[in-house]
């Protein structure tokens, strides 16, 4: 039993800093994390663009879509009619027009040497929106999750 406590303590220390793949960095609001992950008004090469995300999470994200639009324009989608999200919540909203976007997919590498392929697209998108937190931009609702691409 004496040996178990130090092993348990070591396990907790090693396990503590691990960030689940679906979580957002806690020092950011969900809206700010959405902006970092998905808003890119001017297209960047995927390897460069994804390094900004991967540096927060300390792993190679397998796939990510960048919307080539402003946060303001994407936040305006939150004012449109709400629809059901993939998770069955009713806080999703579909864009009224397609936008240019880039889909980045991991092809090789291990963090921090992640390598991505890029596919340019022109599609509609669906975002989940929530009320803003204190440090978020002042909108009635802000985008917090890219639910799907149509």
Swiss-Prot record:
Active-site residues, as the UniProt record annotates them: 38, 145
InterPro entries membership: RNaseA, RNaseA-like_dom_sf, RNaseA_AS, RNaseA_domain
Location, primary (coarse class): secreted
Residues binding substrate, per UniProt: 61-65, 86, 105
Name of one Pfam family that matches: RnaseA
SMART domains: RNAse_Pc
Site positions for Critical for catalytic activity: 61
Gene Ontology biological process terms in this record: antibacterial humoral response; antimicrobial humoral immune response mediated by antimicrobial peptide; defense response to Gram-negative bacterium; defense response to Gram-positive bacterium; innate immune response
Gene Ontology MF terms in the entry: endonuclease activity; nucleic acid binding; RNA nuclease activity
Cellular component terms (Gene Ontology): extracellular space; lysosome
E.C. designation(s): 3.1.27.-
This protein's UniProt keywords: Antibiotic, Antimicrobial, Disulfide bond, Endonuclease, Glycoprotein, Hydrolase, Lysosome, Nuclease, Secreted, Signal
Annotated localization: Secreted; Lysosome; Cytoplasmic granule
Enzyme class: hydrolase
Glycosylation sites: 55, 100
Extent of the signal sequence: 1-23
Disulfides per UniProt: 46-104, 60-114, 78-129, 85-92
Residues carrying the site annotation Facilitates cleavage of polynucleotide substrates: 59
SUPFAM superfamilies the UniProt entry points to: RNase A-like (SSF54076)
Function as written in the Swiss-Prot or TrEMBL entry: Ribonuclease which shows a preference for the pyrimidines uridine and cytosine. Has potent antibacterial activity against a range of Gram-positive and Gram-negative bacteria, including P.aeruginosa, A.baumanii, M.luteus, S.aureus, E.faecalis, E.faecium, S.saprophyticus and E.coli. Causes loss of bacterial membrane integrity, and also promotes agglutination of Gram-negative bacteria. Probably contributes to urinary tract sterility. Bactericidal activity is independent of RNase activity.
Record's subunit section: Interacts (via N-terminus) with bacterial lipopolysaccharide (LPS).
Similarity field: Belongs to the pancreatic ribonuclease family.
Protein name, entry field: Ribonuclease K6
Organism (species): Pongo pygmaeus
């Amino acid at each position: 039993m004496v040996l178990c406590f130090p092993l348990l303590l070591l396990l907790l220390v090693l396990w503590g800093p691990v960030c689940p793949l679906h979580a957002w960095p806690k020092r950011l609001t969900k809206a700010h994390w959405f902006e970092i992950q998905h808003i890119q008004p001017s297209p960047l090469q995927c390897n460069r663009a994804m390094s900004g995300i991967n540096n927060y999470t300390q792993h190679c994200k397998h796939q990510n879509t960048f919307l080539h639009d402003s946060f303001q324009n994407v936040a305006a989608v939150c004012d449109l009619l709400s629809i059901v999200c993939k998770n069955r919540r009713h806080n999703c909203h579909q864009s009224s027009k397609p936008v240019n976007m880039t889909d980045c997919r991991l092809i090789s590498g291990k963090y921090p040497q992640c390598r991505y392929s890029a596919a340019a697209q022109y599609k509609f998108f669906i975002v989940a929106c929530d009320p803003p937190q204190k440090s978020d931009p002042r909108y009635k609702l802000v985008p917090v999750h890219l639910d799907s691409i149509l």
